[in-house]
Amino acid sequence: MCTHRFSVKQLAMLTAAALFVAASAASQDSSDRPPWARKPKPKSTTTGTTNSPSSTPENASPPEPVNKDNRDSNSNDEPTQQGRIRVSVNLVNVLVSVLDDNNRPAPDLPIEAFQIFEEGVKQKIEVFESETKQPLDIALMIDASLSAHKEISFEQQAAAHFIAQVLRPEDRLSVFAFDENVRQMAGFSENVKMLQTAVQRIPDGSGTSIYDALVLGSGALERRKEERRRVIIMVTDGGETTSRADFEAARKAAVRANTLLYSIIVRPVKSESGRNTAGEHAIETITDTTGGAIFFPDTAQDLDIIFDRIDRELRTQYRLGYYPNPRGPVNTYRSIQVKVLDNYKVRHRKTYLTGPQ
């Protein structure tokens, strides 16, 4: 009996030793394999998954990238699945001006009062700010052509007053003059005195290159910081004559830069038969597309009132943001519509351009 018990014990020890040797060999064999030949580890159950090879099961397609917060910086290098086109899914910001029947801002509306649609499809509002505190980048563009020059002194005075009134420490403004050419008289600055001096130095010129001014002004704003509001305030007679760019180039530049355009049309001739109304209509179309406003002062003294209204509107805007559908063709326009409860008047940009991801 004793001998029999000893043999069983010995057998158990030999079995354990054999299992140990087999496990060691398997481990060595796995470590000697190249990475692509090893079996994957079990998939993690955490919510913050990544698209690394070790977390993707064999014979399965990798998960679709989610780039709402732009986390995947290498998404440009990933091939697009056949038949699909990825576009930017960065947050779409929409500035909204809400006005009552007397064109006065309507403040303090809750998020529940707003609905936003892209291509007719309702979107979830991810960002909502009442009276947004986003700093301003403003391109103040003044027509220096001879056709508008009899009003230039009033324009300069009103613009100088506006600069002193609108600028806060975190805001920046640049002064441009345009005739047949476009000149930046002062770079983006918060220095009120320097900017006012630049306005007073605007020279006489000939020709009116409105489209060129919009292209260059939008480009200058687009190169600024992303988290700032971009505004063009253009004072002109509306008589487009000498631009190298055309209407669509100007419109596309303003939309791509997410520029808010306010147009002040100083009409030297009141009768439509003596004016370039085609230029006025083109400016009005671009202004409406960006969500801005157009003004037709009857007298030079009205300029102060208009500048005050623009200032008040900029300080009472709502900011809405949503994440769009990431699928679709690139470099195309997508429509935006904002609805507000009650009978308020609403202005906002009507479209944006998709970009490659």
Segments from the language model and where they lie:
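Bacterial N-terminal signal peptides that target proteins for export
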Residues: 2-14
